[in-house]
Design a protein with these regions (language model features):
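Short, glycine/charged-enriched secondary-structure capping and boundary segments
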Residues: 21-22, 40-43, 85-88, 123-127, ...
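Conserved C-terminal guanine-recognition region of P-loop GTPase G domains, centered on the G4
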Residues: 93-167
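Conserved nucleotide-sensing/catalytic segment adjacent to the nucleotide-binding pocket
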Residues: 66-105
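Conserved nucleotide-binding/hydrolysis micro-motifs of P-loop NTPases
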Residues: 57, 70, 77-80, 115-117, ...
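Structured catalytic cores of enzymes that bind and process phosphorylated ligands/cofactors
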Residues: 25, 32-33, 39, 62, ...
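Canonical P-loop GTPase G-domain recognition
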Residues: 2-14, 145-193
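Conserved G1/Walker A P-loop phosphate-binding module
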Residues: 1-82
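Amphipathic alpha-helical transducer elements in NTP-driven molecular machines
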Residues: 88-92, 119, 179
Length: 193
């Protein structure tokens, strides 16, 4: 169980990245996909991670220390159109550097919004993740916002758009859909040396 999740620090640039020998489980996804809500749900706390009504609120890499054992790491959202070109470039460089130069990443949760067809940026991120030797899981957020039939249809659209062979796990922060499953996965990932 993820009973003890604490915010540790934020990195706004490469120099600010946390140096640690602890495992890191990473969240990636476009702006406003629900990464902060995902963390708050796992922590069972409403305001641990700041949830923004405006997309692109998280512009830093945020580290959360879990059970005094490993880090849950929230990467900045990508693809937000109101970011300046320079902000997009900085965000992209920070994400790339963090993943490329980090041997402590044990798993990546790739979050997509179940209500919408994946964007070109989602497809690029998926292809990029495939090129890495890091295991990842696709999480389809906001699953409570659509009915069961539409949920299956949209998962199929996500799979076809990304050409994904992996399982896609529907998730809802509001209705706690598959929270137990994801906690179980995190525990398995963390126990696997």
């Amino acid at each position: 169980m993820l009973k003890n999740i604490k915010f540790k620090t934020s990195a706004f640039n490469i120099q600010g990245l946390l140096e640690t020998d602890k495992k890191q489980i990473v969240l990636v996804g476009k702006s406003n996909v629900g990464k902060s809500s995902f963390i708050n749900t796992l922590a069972n706390r409403k305001q641990l991670a700041k949830v923004g009504s405006n997309p692109g609120k998280t512009k830093s890499i945020n580290y959360y220390y879990v059970n005094d054992e490993f880090y849950l790491v929230d990467l900045p959202g990508y693809g937000y159109s109101n970011m300046t070109k320079k902000e997009k470039e900085n965000t992209s460089n920070l994400i790339n550097y963090y993943i490329e130069n980090n041997e402590k990443i044990s798993h990546i949760f790739f979050l997509v919004d179940i209500r919408h067809k994946p964007t070109e940026n989602d497809r690029i991120m998926y292809e990029w993740l495939l090129s890495k030797s890091i295991p990842f899981t696709i999480i389809a957020t906001k699953a409570d916002k659509i009915g069961p039939v539409k949920k299956e249809e949209n998962i199929s659209v996500i799979r076809k758009t990304l050409f994904a062979k992996e399982d896609i796990i529907p998730f809802s922060s509001d209705k706690k859909i598959n929270v137990d499953l994801i906690e179980h996965m995190i525990n398995l990932i963390n126990s696997d040396s």
